[in-house]
Amino acid sequence: SVRDNLILAAQVLRGFFRPFTKAQANKFADEYIKLLEIKTASADTPIKSLSGGNQQKVILGRWLLTHPEYLILDEPTRGIDVGTKIEIQKLVLKLASEGMSVTFISSETDEMLRTCSRLIVMRDRRMVGELSGNELSQSMIMSTIAGGDTE
């Protein structure tokens, strides 16, 4: 269910010998369904019946419920609808503005420009460029990707 998936990582941290009560699990689920605007009939809905974008939000919520200081998101918006993609990007920006460190991995340059304050370009497992501030532009990103080093 959506509830079980949302609390999974927090339950692992807490320990399976100290399970959340049904009331606690419902409270967490309701809070994160609202926070992430997960479109579901209820917290009891099987996760497989949700859209891909809402499944992605549940997975993101699973980790946010652990209150991490650092979040690594690898292509979190790949294959989901445009509306949900924008919602996730806004959430990432909000988390960063609240002090969370976020590594956002994406192959979409437009998305990188919307979500990143600093961008690292990798090729063959090596860093080939770092862009920030005025350097963050479509042309600079494409030049760095194509092989023009910025270091």
Feature map (PLM): residue ranges:
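Glycine-rich phosphate-binding loops of nucleotide-dependent enzymes
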Residues: 1-151
